[in-house]
C-alpha cells in the first residue's frame, strides 16, 4: 500500500522555510530580534566563518578523534553562516548537528585518554554514542527546537568534566584558553537575556573567542596524546 508523505515544515527544493499553521520554530538570536525576526544577521553570519578558519590557521590535530573535532568545527562555521544569514531550518540543522558531533568526538577522545582499554571504557563510550544518536534524532523534531540549548548544555558539561579530569591526570594547562572561550560565552548569554543594540555584539564575540580559546585546548590535549605515543607502543585500535 503506497504512502503519501506530506512535507509541511520544509521545502527541500528551495532550501527555505515554508509556512505552517501549526508548527513553527523561533530565531532566538538578539540580532534578528532587533530586526523583527528577519534576516540576515550580518554580524552573526560573517563572524561565524572565524570558526571555520581557525583550524586552518593553527593546524589540525594528529590524534584522529581530535582531528574529527577540528573537521566538525570547520564545517560548523560554514553551517552557522548559512543559519544566521537565512534563518531557516536547513541551516539550523547543519549548525547544531556539527556542534553535537564535535562534542561527541571530543568526549570520545577524552574518555580514551582517561581510561585504559577496558569494559568500563567501552561502556562509557557506548553511553556517549547512544546519547549522541538520541540527541540527533530528537533534534530533527521541530517541536523540540527549544530544548537544544538545555540538552547541549548538559552534553558539553560532561565534556568539561572530562577536560578537567584528563588535564589533572596529565598536568595539562588549559584554564587560560578555556577562560577565553568562557568570556565569549558570557557575551553571548548576556546578548540573549538583555538584548539591545549594544549587547547584540555578544554573539559575534562568542564566534571570535570560542574558537581562539577552545581550539588551543584541543591542540594542547593533542600534544599530550602524541607525547604518550612516543613513550609506548600503542595498539593501533587505540587510535580508532
Predicted regions and their residues:
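Multi-pass alpha-helical transmembrane bundles in non-GPCR membrane proteins
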Residues: 2-240
Amino acid at each position: 500500500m503506497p504512502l503519501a508523505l506530506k512535507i509541511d515544515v520544509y521545502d527541500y527544493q528551495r532550501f527555505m522555510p515554508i509556512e505552517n499553521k501549526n508548527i513553527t520554530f523561533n530565531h532566538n538570536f538578539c540580532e534578528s530580534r532587533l530586526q523583527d525576526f528577519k534576516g540576515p544577521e550580518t554580524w552573526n553570519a560573517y563572524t561565524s566563518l572565524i570558526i571555520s578558519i581557525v583550524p586552518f590557521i593553527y593546524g589540525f590535530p594528529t590524534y584522529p578523534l581530535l582531528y574529527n573535532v577540528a573537521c566538525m568545527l570547520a564545517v560548523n562555521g560554514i553551517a552557522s553562516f548559512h543559519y544566521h544569514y537565512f534563518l531557516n531550518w536547513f541551516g539550523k540543522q547543519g549548525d547544531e548537528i556539527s556542534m553535537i558531533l564535535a562534542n561527541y568526538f571530543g568526549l570520545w577522545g577524552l574518555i580514551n585518554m582517561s581510561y585504559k582499554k577496558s569494559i568500563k571504557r567501552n561502556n562509557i563510550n557506548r553511553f556517549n554514542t547512544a546519547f549522541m544518536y538520541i540527541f540527533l534524532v530528537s533534534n530533527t523534531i521541530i517541536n523540540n527546537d527549544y530544548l537544544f540549548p538545555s540538552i547541549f548544555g548538559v552534553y558539553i558539561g560532561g565534556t568539561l568534566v572530562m577536560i578537567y579530569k584528563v588535564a589533572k591526570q596529565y598536568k595539562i594547562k588549559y584554564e587560560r584558553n578555556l577562560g577565553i572561550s568562557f568570556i565569549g560565552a558570557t557575551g553571548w548569554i548576556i546578548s540573549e537575556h538583555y538584548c539591545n543594540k549594544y549587547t547584540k555584539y555578544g554573539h559575534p564575540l562568542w564566534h571570535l573567542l570560542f574558537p581562539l580559546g577552545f581550539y588551543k585546548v584541543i591542540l594542547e590535549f593533542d600534544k599530550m596524546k602524541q607525547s604518550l605515543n612516543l613513550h609506548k607502543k600503542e595498539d593501533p585500535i587505540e587510535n580508532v
